[in-house]
A protein has these predicted regions:
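Glycine-rich phosphate-binding active-site loops on the catalytic face of alpha/beta enzymes
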Residues: 52-60, 92-104, 132-135, 139-165
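Glycine/Thr-rich beta-alpha phosphate-binding loop at enzyme active sites
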Residues: 43-45, 50, 73-114, 118, ...
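Alpha-helix-loop-beta-strand connector modules within alpha/beta enzyme cores
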Residues: 13-35, 52, 57-75, 104-132, ...
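Glycine-rich, proline-tolerant flexible connector loops at the mouths of alpha/beta enzymes
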Residues: 2-12, 95-102
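Alpha/beta enzyme core
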Residues: 26, 36-39, 43-46, 63, ...
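A broad detector of short, well-ordered amphipathic alpha-helices
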Residues: 15, 22, 38, 78-81, ...
Length: 175
């Protein structure tokens, strides 16, 4: 579970992070904070995810220590290799389809996605515009999972949408 909230001020972000951390701990779900190392440290989050214009993975590792999860966004093989070299535990790669959730996200080809998965030794998570209608198109790219927002939160029945997308993703990854 990753908390990515760009609109909240620091105090409200901290309040939200504490509530979500409590839920994640209850259900044994790792909790990663997007781009805010200080709040991750304050609430003892399981890790931090940073983008290309955020703090470098090596600096995040120095602040968090060896046991926390560090994820890095990447759009190229070069960025992916550099993130791995600097201590990233996983990569978030995309946008693999057009997305409205992140206006500045540039689409990457599935060929680039596959090249990234072949170049690195750490897990690659595809992100961006993924839905139950298109997740199977990622088969053969080498990803180990997906990250979504709208695919579940835009649905009326979030629980059912999550179950269905999880099943489709597992089938796609195993194919």
């Amino acid at each position: 579970m990753q908390l990515r909230e760009k609109e909240l001020d620091e105090a409200h972000f901290l309040e939200e992070a504490k509530k979500i951390k409590e839920l994640c701990d209850r259900y044994h779900v790792p909790f990663v904070i997007n781009d805010n190392v200080d709040i991750a440290l304050e609430i003892d989050a399981d890790g931090v995810h940073v983008g290309q214009s955020d703090m470098e993975a090596g600096d995040v590792r120095a602040k968090l220590g060896p046991d926390k999860i560090i994820g890095v966004s990447a759009q190229t093989v070069r960025q992916a290799l550099l993130a791995q070299e600097r201590g990233a535990d996983y990569l978030g790669v995309g946008a693999v389809f057009h997305t409205d959730s992140k206006a500045d996200a540039a689409d990457i080809s599935h060929e680039t996605l596959k090249a990234i998965t072949e170049a690195v030794d750490i897990p690659v998570i595809a992100i961006g515009g993924i839905s139950k209608e298109n997740v199977s198109e990622l088969s053969g790219t080498g990803i180990c999972g997906i990250a979504v927002i709208s695919a579940i939160f835009a649905e009326k029945d979030i629980k059912n949408a999550t179950k269905k997308l999880k099943k489709l993703t597992e089938e796609m990854v195993e194919a």
